[in-house]
Amino acid sequence: MSPMMRALQHANYTFAKKISHTADSQDQRHRMIPGSRPLLTLADTREPDYITPALLQENPRGKEVYERAMQDAWYAKNQLLARGVPQEIALYLLPNAKSIRLVESGSLLHLLHKWTMRTCFNAQEEIYQSSLDEIAQLREVHPQLTKHIGPPCHLRAGVTTPICTEGSHFCGVKVWLDFPNVQRRI
């Protein structure tokens, strides 16, 4: 690591997040950005507490089916608890859409790597949006840094080719022309 890059280890940021269990599991791939996650047994709710994917938000029939499935999952879990099944067993019924609230902290060096990977249009939608939210919070305290943050194509444009590092998985959108103001369509 170059001496200039080492300085990025000294700037640290902390974010409070609410994401689905699925997104949290994927987000944990960035091991250098640790998070404090609650035990599911301590964060259990009687009422459904889940994340709805953007794709379903835009589809009334799909959203209706999805919400019914969430209601059914929590109802079944609550029925098991009422019948004396241990909580750690009953929680197996909860879907991966269950909301997880956590606090995550990391150095600017490691967050830059995460944001580069997770602001690409090929990133999972929920993690993409979470990364944009984190960058927006960073912009409030250190606006001068955010021009150096974005997907690989944003960082490589005008510097090297190919601009997109995804090869045959190129999303087809020239994100680098107007990041972060570009619209992501699902």
Where do the model's predicted regions map?
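A conserved ligand/cofactor-binding region detector
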Residues: 1-186
